């Protein structure tokens, strides 16, 4: 009898012993998810000595919709990680299915073969990124510390509130680390982003219309799904709009099933997320779930800081301080329409290291402002269009009309297909005249 081999993503990731004394690094990265690992890989590529701090210990799960779009895959290929990812279980999606409250469906094909996406369970996706980051950091004389709790952000008030490092603990032992740049990559509740936004600049950390709440479960044997390759699904349902319900296959007869809605809208719902999900599965989608089984303890909720534009000089939520940058969810860069955040997380990691390389001798507020401006220049149109589409989906009559028309009108399907990969097509999709022309005539 052959022993069953334990999947690699369930194994521990071993790191070097923690250095004693006050060691100075080139860059401290707080957070070992995709944004932090990508930042570390880009930094190691430039030869920087990096300290990566992660509050949990791998293997660990991360609550997410699990979709990884074409933008993220391009960065992973650039970092030479994509081939490793392809060897782990995943689902390839080449289309997106939308349905409305009238049960009308339209399936939009992604015609660009380079833009197809994957659905990866985050437990193995993040493991691969963290393992790669660990190897590259340690090869460059850097360190990775798991189970580390950041307790204090070290701020030099005489140097215009410059962040110079962090203090924290591991197993009740205190440590202090210094670096000319600290990168906040700790997700929605990143201590670095809270220090910058709340403590130093006294700005709003949570803005309910720019903040989404989501709930996820894993189910086996949901009906009407090709578990090898096909569509991810977005469903607009009475009682859930302006939120949406999703079904994302991940392979091996398993789906990531969940729903998301902004905090501003959730407060008006009688049911909370878990109750809403139960209502959808047992009443609206009962036939598709009649033979399905819920994976025990997989139901979890989380929050997403959205990259919807603000009416401020910075356009987006602040993502820099003196001697400090924010990346990924810590920088509030989640797509306002789809809820996908990994692509923008990896992009922001690359841009952060690029700006540090240009100003490594004196990374000040002006450098941080240039970083945020470049992020806006690269993502502003895309995020603005996504925010407009999110606002359109708040109107049930418009969703029903739009999906009904798209089902019958090839020209509208073409715009939708191109909008999945093209900024110009996204602009067309949010143009009132083009929408009016396609919907009415």
Feature locations, PLM:
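Predominantly flavin-linked oxidoreductase catalytic cores and closely associated redox partners
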Residues: 132-291
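Glycine-rich FAD pyrophosphate-binding loop
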Residues: 28, 44-64
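C-terminal helical "tail/cap" subdomain of flavin- and related membrane-associated enzymes
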Residues: 354-441
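Extreme N-terminal leader/targeting segments of oxidoreductases
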Residues: 1-27, 42-48
């Amino acid at each position: 009898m052959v022993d069953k081999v334990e999947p690699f993503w369930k194994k521990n990731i071993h790191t070097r012993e923690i250095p004693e004394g006050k060691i100075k690094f080139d860059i401290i990265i707080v957070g070992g998810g995709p944004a932090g690992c990508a930042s570390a890989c880009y930094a190691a590529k430039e030869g920087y000595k990096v300290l990566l701090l992660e509050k949990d210990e791998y293997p660990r799960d991360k609550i997410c919709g699990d979709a990884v779009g074409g933008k993220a895959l391009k960065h992973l290929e650039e970092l030479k990680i994509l081939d490793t990812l392809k060897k782990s279980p995943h689902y390839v999606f080449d289309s997106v299915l939308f349905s409305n409250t009238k049960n009308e469906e339209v399936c939009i094909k992604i015609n660009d073969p380079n833009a197809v996406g994957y659905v990866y369970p985050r437990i193995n996706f993040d493991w691969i990124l963290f393992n790669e980051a660990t190897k590259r950091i340690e090869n460059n004389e850097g360190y990775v510390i798991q189970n580390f709790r950041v307790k204090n952000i070290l701020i030099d008030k005489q140097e215009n509130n410059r962040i110079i490092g962090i203090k924290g603990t591991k197993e009740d032992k205190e440590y202090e680390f210094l670096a000319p740049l600290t990168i906040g990559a700790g997700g929605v509740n990143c201590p670095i982003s809270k220090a910058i936004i709340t403590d130093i600049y006294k700005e709003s950390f949570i803005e309910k219309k720019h903040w989404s709440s989501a709930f996820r479960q894993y189910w086996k044997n949901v009906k009407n799904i090709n578990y090898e390759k096909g569509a991810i699904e977005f469903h607009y349902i009475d009682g859930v709009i302006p939120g949406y319900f999703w079904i994302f296959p991940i392979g091996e007869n398993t789906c990531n099933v969940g729903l998301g809605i902004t905090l501003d809208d959730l407060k008006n719902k009688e049911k909370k997320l878990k109750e809403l999900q139960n209502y959808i599965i047992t009443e609206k989608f009962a036939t598709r779930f009649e033979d399905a089984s819920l994976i025990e303890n997989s139901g979890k909720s989380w929050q997403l800081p959205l990259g919807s534009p603000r009416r401020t000089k910075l356009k987006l939520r602040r993502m820099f301080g003196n001697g400090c940058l924010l990346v990924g969810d810590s920088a509030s860069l989640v797509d306002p329409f789809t809820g996908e955040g990994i692509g923008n997380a990896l992009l922001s990691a690359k841009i952060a290291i690029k700006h540090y390389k240009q100003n490594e001798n004196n990374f000040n507020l002006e450098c941080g402002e240039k970083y945020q401006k470049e992020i806006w220049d690269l993502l502003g149109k895309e995020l603005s269009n996504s925010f407009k589409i999110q606002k359109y989906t708040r109107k049930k009559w418009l969703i029903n009309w739009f999906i009904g028309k798209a089902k019958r009108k090839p020209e509208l399907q073409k715009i939708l297909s191109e909008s999945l990969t093209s900024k110009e097509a996204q602009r067309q999709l949010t143009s009132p005249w083009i929408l009016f022309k396609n919907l009415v005539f």
